[in-house]
Amino acid sequence: MPTIPVDKEDLFKLLGRSYTTEEFDELCFQFGIELDEDTTEDVKGTDERPQLKIEVPANRYDMLCIEGIAQALNEFLGNTSAPNYKLSPSKPEISLTIKESTYPIRQYAASAILRNVNLDERAYDSFIALQDKLHANLCRNRTLVAIGTHDLDTLTPPFTYEALAPKDIVFKPLNQTKEINGEELMEFYEKDKNIGKFLHIIKDSPVYPVMLDANRTVASLPPIINSDHSKITLNTKNVWIDVTGTDRTKTEIVINQLVAMFSRYCKEPFEIEPVQIISEHNNETRVCPNITPRTAKAEISYINSCVGLNYSGEEISKLLKKMSLDATPSTEERDILDVKIPITRSDILHQCDIMEDVAIGYGYDNLKKTKPQAESLVAAPLPVNKVADILRLASSQAGYLEVMPLTLSSHDENFAWLKQKDDGTKAVKLENPKTIEYQVVRTTLLPGILKTVKENRKHSLPIKVFECGDIVLKNPELERGAFNQRNWAALYVGKTSGFEMVQGLLGKIMQTMRTPWLENPSKDQRRGYWIEEDKENTTFFPGRGAKIYFRNADNAEAKAIGSIGVLHPEVMNNFDIPYAASSVEINAEVFL
């Protein structure tokens, strides 16, 4: 979790009173943050000011600076209400046009203006420190999002955000005296400890993103560095903020956090000047920032049951107010709270987050200790796990050993090595795999079992192994886009293929699950199973593979639940196994 150093005297001034170390430590504990260190004793006799080093949750981006910590604690203590952010003027007078050329490298941008700001030295330092903390945490070292802040009075609106060839971008980088182009900039900062670590983000791109004003003056080269021309100082009165990124959601979160924390220093506190974002090529034209609170619903009964309370909607609303959330009982549904989530609380994603805030507002120390009911102490296996245990026992009784391979595999192992083609509809792929071994989440248990046999091929024959585990398949209709499926698979490896061995094992499994073999399924409409030749499955030797069909009730529609067959010699060669083998795999969830 991030540790935020704040000036002790300034923080206590913002909180309206002084605290002993023990008192402030207790306040932090109640709120869910942690006082890591008080440097008062360490700086005695020096010119340094005492600091409090506070550890905050990684998802509380609003607490990455002293302003946010003080605001959150003051609301928790009841000293103040949540700020009322407002846009002025309501219709933007300044625009930022995003060109289509930015799409391949850094396609999203957001912007806002803070007018008539009054920053003293410590507020200025806090402004810079917040950007650094956001860059290190939410922005993932500027790979996802990068921030630029500028003295608006040195630039001429409207602004454009586009991508140009490196040699065409010429400007004086921050705190430098000489103009250089994009190519020279990469060489100049290559060994710089601060800037050098960000160069790789765009270095190999044929174009670099750049922020320009109406006179084509460079304001920044995101995500590397700002221009010295528009740098902010203690004398800056009007601040233009630009945020660029590859992630739309995180870009919006960052701009909201910046304006929420530092609009308090405007002549009219919490007043923000919007910017018109013009992005016609992808229909992203909008007014930025969007300070409209998000809305969510939470069940009163759910909150009470989780926290152990018996509070009304009004009482819960008072607790949520301490956590910056504006809640009111729904006028339409008796058990529902309508919750407004401010722009500072991007960590609120689900009603469980709202429930957690109720618990913090109530105080964990105030929760009564109660004995759980005896029946709540008795656990029971999930149905899918119970089925899996039955299949494991039956397989073991048949003389098969259980293996537990990894759920990730390489793309080739999951498809090409099994003589299958990836049509893009099944496998969940890792975006940034660390190694070629972990490119996809397996869609079948077979590759893992074959890899296990490969590493144990020196053992005496036959090798009989099985696995009962999850595979993952895509489903775009689901919110998460994919789902887990519990499968059971077995493999027989020997000098002969041993198809009769895996067929016998399948029969034992079905007998254990009280599922009879149907000799003539077209006439016999009972619950049961049968197999039919599968000419399309190229994993198996031609004419030696079949689909397994299952009817889960009398007169019900049958469906294919798996496959059985003799593995193709090429498959065995791909996994470096010099023997013949047969396999069987079924969806175990059909027995639920």
From Swiss-Prot:
Family: Belongs to the phenylalanyl-tRNA synthetase beta subunit family. Type 2 subfamily.
Subunit structure: Tetramer of two alpha and two beta subunits.
Keywords: Aminoacyl-tRNA synthetase, ATP-binding, Cytoplasm, Ligase, Magnesium, Metal-binding, Nucleotide-binding, Protein biosynthesis
Top-rank EC class of the record's enzyme: ligase
Entries under InterPro entries matching the protein: aa-tRNA-synth_II/BPL/LPL, B3/B4_tRNA-bd, DNA-bd_dom_put_sf, Phe-tRNA-ligase_IIc_bsu, Phe-tRNA-synth_IIc_bsu_arc_euk, Phe-tRNA_synthase-like_B3/B4, PheRS_beta_core, PhetRS_B1
Catalytic activity line of the entry: tRNA(Phe) + L-phenylalanine + ATP = L-phenylalanyl-tRNA(Phe) + AMP + diphosphate + H(+)
Binding positions for Mg(2+) per the UniProt entry: 347, 353, 356-357
Lineage start: Eukaryota, Fungi, Dikarya, Ascomycota, Saccharomycotina
Domain of life of the source: Eukaryota
Alphabetical list of Pfam families matching this protein: B3_4, B5, PhetRS_B1, tRNA_synthFbeta
Ranges for domain B5: 291-369
Subcellular location: Cytoplasm
Enzyme Commission number: 6.1.1.20
Cofactor: Mg(2+)
GO CC annotation: phenylalanine-tRNA ligase complex
GO MF annotation list: ATP binding; magnesium ion binding; phenylalanine-tRNA ligase activity; sequence-specific mRNA binding
Protein name according to UniProt: Phenylalanine--tRNA ligase beta subunit
Organism of origin: Candida albicans (Yeast)
CDD domains on file: PheRS_beta_core
BP terms from Gene Ontology: phenylalanyl-tRNA aminoacylation
